[in-house]
Curated annotation (Swiss-Prot):
GO terms for cellular component: cytosolic large ribosomal subunit. Binds 23S rRNA and is also seen to make contacts with the A and possibly P site tRNAs. PROSITE patterns: RIBOSOMAL_L16_1, RIBOSOMAL_L16_2. It comes from Azoarcus sp. (strain BH72). Keywords: Ribonucleoprotein, Ribosomal protein, RNA-binding, rRNA-binding, tRNA-binding. The keyword Transmembrane does not apply. Residues 1-22 are annotated as: Disordered. The gene is rplP. This is Large ribosomal subunit protein uL16. Residues 1-13 have a biased composition (Basic residues). Belongs to the universal ribosomal protein uL16 family. Transmembrane segments: none annotated. GO terms for biological process: translation. The lineage of its organism: Bacteria, Pseudomonadati, Pseudomonadota, Betaproteobacteria, Rhodocyclales.
Amino acid sequence: MLQPSRRKYRKEQKGRNTGLATRGTKVSFGDFGLKAIARGRLTARQIESARRAMTRHIKRGGRIWIRIFPDKPISKKPAEVRMGNGKGNPEYWVAEIQPGKVLYEMDGVDEALAREAFRLAAAKLPLETVFVTRQVG
C-alpha cells in the first residue's frame, strides 16, 4: 500500500478540505481518466482496491497511472481509552481529494474497456467520479 517513506513530523492536524483542485485536473499521461467531482478522503486501502479492480479487468492490456498519493496521517486512539493523555498514534494514510482532481489514468486499451474498468474502480471509492478523455490541443 502507498505511504510516505519518511516524514518530518509523525502526526498532522485535521485541517479542512476546501476549494477546488488546481493541479492534476487534466488527463496528462494516458488517454482516459477517472476524475473526482466530489470532495473527500481516499485511504491507501481504497486507492489500492480500486487499482486492483482496474488491473484485473484490463488484464495485461494497458497501462495505469495513479495520480494521487496518501500523504496525510490519520491518528486514532485505541478502543476504551479515556479522553486526554495526548493524541493517538497514526493509524492509516489518506489523500485529501478536491473536486476536479484526476485520480487514475489509463492507456493502451479501447474506450469501452477503459470505461468498464473505471466503473469497477469507482464502485470501490467513496467519492462521486466521472469518466474523462484526453483533450487534444
